[in-house]
Swiss-Prot record:
Protein name: Small ribosomal subunit protein bS18
InterPro entries: Ribosomal_bS18, Ribosomal_bS18_CS, Ribosomal_bS18_sf
GO biological process: translation
Organism: Rhodobacter capsulatus (strain ATCC BAA-309 / NBRC 16581 / SB1003)
Domain of life (superkingdom): Bacteria
Keyword match Iron-sulfur: no
Amino acid sequence: MATKPFFRRRKVCPFSGDNAPKIDYKDVRLLQRYISERGKIVPARITAVSAKKQRELAQAIKRARFLALLPYAVK
């Protein structure tokens, strides 16, 4: 008897939609959700962010790091 194939449900981008938050480099609380404990940017396949929004998110995180709002690395 063949087993039924397992289909993983596609996650929805948290930045697409009507009342989705805007990506802003000054919004440190929002950006910290997309940074690992070590300070690295979490990949889109884990956070389910679309490719376009992942680029915006990475740019905002890098900008916030440059302005010392976020750390480059956590020891």
